[in-house]
Amino acid sequence: MKKIITTALIAGCILFVISYGGLYLGVKFFPGLFVAYDNPLFNSDGSRDVLFYLHAFIISFALSWFWDRFKVLFKGNFIMRGVEFGLVYSLIALLPVMWISFSSLDINLVMVLSWFLYGLAQAIIAGLVFAKVNP
């Protein structure tokens, strides 16, 4: 259990920094993509903002548990194991969520694809951390 918590905290910190930096760079270099977020669907009164920033840690704890349970199924060096882990998670969890989001919300395909790629990147990065720290 200690290994799950430790790797989750390490991955959470790394994902938080990368996510926050990626958001800043995304707005700076791809402002057109973020125009779609000027929509009542995405506006919040600010009372739940902390939940957004905790996302990196929530996903890291979930993925850390998943890694600890199924790590024996991923073969190869730590890079191959981390990438395969990210791909498996993306196909099992992200793809269905993106499908239902696109089909039920008033969002465009580019937005959904950016969410999928963001989630895939998070899962691969977390997988690399887990494969290195908790082989």
Feature roles, as predicted:
Residues 1-135:
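Juxtamembrane/disordered regions of integral membrane proteins
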